[in-house]
């Protein structure tokens, strides 16, 4: 808790800036595609609850900032609420010539595009930020060549030796030493097969990463898998790779994809009990990390913003009603059936989805409190 309080002058402004930026970009994706699709937009809100300030534009859209800055929404004509729950009863009261401007009255592909645009905007923002960082600062890399093997580690037991070059893990190519850490960290106590190159010959070595608790440079505890190898300048050839604009965009997309796959790996292992759920954090932990990044500099803040943007985009694509992914799931069913899911079924699904999101929020908050006072 002292770490959070010590960084308070950095934490609050940085957290609010990041949250406002990411929410604004996400909702702007919905807004722009909705407008392009001819759907009337009633409100664009950053935050929930009572309005702090705002204005109404010439199209009749109310732009506002609200008291609780933990999200946002775009309210379309014909929506029942901020979650874009369809209001079928109200639709019947709208004049036929106006129904085409409601969200519910728009063509299926326009609704799907409008909903998908929010997460896509988050992914595009992340790619852009990573591209800028790679263009300016480059990317620190090291070859996947072993310099030392920890005693009694999974690697030592499997027969890994200094000088071995890692070629692949479970058939996935390894290009840098960081690729090893990224793949192994989310697979504690899960058997893997590491292919190494030794004196020109490829050798497959089965091993099981050990579950370890480590502390990152910022003081945050984390549980991860490790096989017990390291590298150094002589073996790994530490260097900074620089990229032109187009290469940087490609690297930005690749980095975003790595975050997506790493998150999905973590969630799948969490589901089967291989990873601890206490690493699921909420606003308090994000705020604390925001303050830590701010103390390190603008590059770290931007990198953190990109990571959060990918996470928000991915979270919203989860097939849970009330989230964007839940809406897209309904549209997929509608496309297959040739007609929408019935209002009663949708209403029940939205209630269940809301309960799931609420439980996740409470769980993350509980983890934050335990972390704060632990």
UniProtKB/Swiss-Prot annotation:
<feature type="domain" description="PDZ">
    <location>
        <begin position="126"/>
        <end position="199"/>
    </location>
</feature>
<keyword id="KW-0472">Membrane</keyword>
<keyword id="KW-0479">Metal-binding</keyword>
<feature type="transmembrane region" description="Helical">
    <location>
        <begin position="112"/>
        <end position="134"/>
    </location>
</feature>
<dbReference type="GO" id="GO:0046872">
    <property type="term" value="F:metal ion binding"/>
</dbReference>
<keyword id="KW-1133">Transmembrane helix</keyword>
<keyword id="KW-0812">Transmembrane</keyword>
<dbReference type="InterPro" id="IPR041489">
    <property type="entry name" value="PDZ_6"/>
</dbReference>
<dbReference type="GO" id="GO:0005886">
    <property type="term" value="C:plasma membrane"/>
</dbReference>
<comment type="similarity">
    <text>Belongs to the peptidase M50B family.</text>
</comment>
<feature type="transmembrane region" description="Helical">
    <location>
        <begin position="36"/>
        <end position="55"/>
    </location>
</feature>
<keyword id="KW-0378">Hydrolase</keyword>
<dbReference type="InterPro" id="IPR036034">
    <property type="entry name" value="PDZ_sf"/>
</dbReference>
<feature type="binding site">
    <location>
        <position position="26"/>
    </location>
    <ligand>
        <name>Zn(2+)</name>
    </ligand>
</feature>
<dbReference type="GO" id="GO:0006508">
    <property type="term" value="P:proteolysis"/>
</dbReference>
<dbReference type="Pfam" id="PF02163">
    <property type="entry name" value="Peptidase_M50"/>
</dbReference>
<protein>
    <recommendedName>
        <fullName>Putative zinc metalloprotease R01501</fullName>
        <ecNumber>3.4.24.-</ecNumber>
    </recommendedName>
</protein>
<keyword id="KW-0645">Protease</keyword>
<feature type="active site">
    <location>
        <position position="27"/>
    </location>
</feature>
<feature type="binding site">
    <location>
        <position position="30"/>
    </location>
    <ligand>
        <name>Zn(2+)</name>
    </ligand>
</feature>
<keyword id="KW-1003">Cell membrane</keyword>
<keyword id="KW-0862">Zinc</keyword>
<keyword id="KW-0482">Metalloprotease</keyword>
<keyword id="KW-0997">Cell inner membrane</keyword>
<feature type="transmembrane region" description="Helical">
    <location>
        <begin position="301"/>
        <end position="323"/>
    </location>
</feature>
<dbReference type="InterPro" id="IPR001478">
    <property type="entry name" value="PDZ"/>
</dbReference>
<dbReference type="InterPro" id="IPR004387">
    <property type="entry name" value="Pept_M50_Zn"/>
</dbReference>
<dbReference type="GO" id="GO:0004222">
    <property type="term" value="F:metalloendopeptidase activity"/>
</dbReference>
<feature type="transmembrane region" description="Helical">
    <location>
        <begin position="348"/>
        <end position="367"/>
    </location>
</feature>
<dbReference type="Pfam" id="PF17820">
    <property type="entry name" value="PDZ_6"/>
</dbReference>
<dbReference type="InterPro" id="IPR008915">
    <property type="entry name" value="Peptidase_M50"/>
</dbReference>
